[in-house]
Structures are given as C-alpha cells and as structure tokens.
Regions:
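Short, helix-capping/interhelical loops that line the mouth of catalytic, cofactor-
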Residues: 1-7, 51-110, 146-158, 162-169
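An N-terminal domain-cap segment
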Residues: 1-46, 55-57, 78
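Short, contiguous alpha-helical
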Residues: 28-69, 115-172, 226
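Acidic/histidine-rich alpha-helical segments that form the ligand environment
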Residues: 78-109, 121-131, 138, 180-188, ...
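A glycine-rich beta-turn/hairpin centered on an aromatic-Pro dipeptide
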Residues: 161-198
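Acidic/His-leaning functional-site neighborhoods
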Residues: 189-223
Length: 263
C-alpha cells in the first residue's frame, strides 16, 4: 500500500486548499455543485472549511468521542457567500488543522469514526488531505476550471478507498441492497499511468491487492479518473466493462461513509 508521510499530508491539506481557492477565484459562488446536490459553490467551501475546523478540534483536544459537526453539515445559511471573506476563512482553517496535527504528532490519540477507540491522529492527516482533494475536484467542475492531481496522491487516495471497502459496513448484508459477496465476484482496477488493483469479493469479507487478474468487471483509465469514478464524480477517462451492476453495487457499498451529509 502506498503511504505518504504525515508531514506530506500536513503540507497537502494547506496546498490543496490553496489550489481549491485558486479554482474559485472570480467564480460565481452561487453556481450549483453537481456532485453535492443542493449545495452551491459557496456552501461547498463552507463545508470544506467546516471539515477542517471539526478535525482540528478533534486533534487539538484529543477528543475521545464524537465532536459536534455543525460547521460541516449546517449549510443552509450560506447561500450567498462573499469570496473576499470566505477564501481567507478557508485558508485559515486549513492552516489551523495542519498546525494542530504537527503539534500533536502522528501517534497522538484521538477519536475517529473508523475506530472503536482513540487512534493515531495520522488518520486525520490523510483523511482531510483527500477530503480536500475530492472537493477541490467538485469546485473545479463547478467553476469551469481544470482539475489535476499529483500521481502519488491519487494512488494513495485510491488505496484509502480500497481500505474502506473492507470495513464491515461495506459488505455486511443489508435489506435494501443485493448481497455483495459471492462466487466469481472479483473486480480489476487498471490505472493506466500508475498500477493495477484487484478486489476479491469471493470470501467472507472483501480483500484487495495490487496486481492484475481475471475479473468479473474492470474499470480502466488514468488513476485520477479512477479516483473520481470511485467517488461517483464525472470521470471521462474511466472506462468500464463486464458486470457493471457489480461495480456499481461495490461503489455504493464501499462509499457507505459518504451517505452522511458531510461528505
């Protein structure tokens, strides 16, 4: 698995936020955000800045349980934002989060939603990096700007998604969805500029590995497009073949953590 350093993540939280701000410079902040129905561009930026402040509080206070996320989800009042106010606020939140992470160090313990007890805050450094990356893509699309992403970041973001796809919430039976696991169910993801991964759904729980194998379904394209495809964002470079229904089901189940309003 690709693992970038804690320091790199702390840097990227700030630099990705700066790039996001550049995408929206001069843009209409009331423009709708396609990937986040009901939000406009200003609300998207409020969400990202709220995410950063939420994570900063968790890290700074070494929270041992969930922290209220009103700044992340309560966006109804932010329908007509002023970029001159919003962009500096967004930058400030990213810098505060990065500083809190550095002050804590990667091994300090705090709550996170993926663990049943306080865990190293390195989780938050990585998670907020890719939270910012994906919403930067949303902002670029809404503003008519070009989105690109460093290959190392894209690979790690893909593997973060694959990691989440092995959590129980991503495969345990649900009455409202078909079963995910079963005989012959393997997926192949071919990043034409980075590498390949196989997801095996034939056992008692999903597993993934790097490499190539015969599969029931394949998604192929540049690694950034595969990342956007996973997140159900427009990904014109991603092509799929085989059991598309299985791919769609896997994406829906693997993205269980996106079902909450904050993502």
């Amino acid at each position: 698995m690709t693992s970038l350093t804690f320091e790199r993540h702390c840097d990227e939280i700030v630099s990705q936020t700066e790039r996001l701000s550049a995408h929206v410079r001069g843009a209409d902040l009331t423009a709708p955000v396609v990937a986040c129905p009901g939000w406009n561009l200003g609300q998207l930026l409020r969400h990202v800045g709220g995410d950063h402040r939420w994570a900063e509080e968790i890290v700074r206070t070494r929270a041992t349980g969930p922290v209220p996320d009103d700044l992340v989800n309560d966006l109804g009042a932010y329908t007509d934002e002023d970029a001159a106010v919003l962009v500096p606020w967004l930058t400030e939140g990213a810098e505060q989060l990065s500083a809190a992470l550095r002050a804590a160090g990667p091994d300090a313990l705090a709550w996170n939603p993926s663990a049943d007890r306080p865990a190293p805050v390195a989780f938050w450094a990585r998670r907020m990096t890719y939270e910012t990356v994906v919403h930067r893509a949303d902002a670029a699309l809404a503003a008519g700007a070009r989105f690109d992403l460093d290959g190392e970041l894209a690979v790690e973001a893909v593997e973060e998604w694959l990691e989440y796809s092995t959590f129980p919430e991503a495969f345990e039976p649900r009455p409202d969805l078909p079963d995910l696991l079963g005989s012959g169910r393997t997926l192949h993801f071919d990043a034409t500029d980075a590498g390949e991964w196989v997801v095996d759904l034939t056992g008692e729980r999903p597993t993934w590995r790097t490499g190539a194998d015969g599969a029931a379904a394949t998604a192929r394209g540049p690694v950034t497009d595969l990342l956007l495809y996973f997140y159900k964002r427009p990904a014109p470079g991603a092509q799929t073949k085989g059991d598309i229904a299985l791919l769609d089901l896997w994406r829906a189940r693997a993205g269980f953590w996106l079902e909450a309003p904050e993502a």
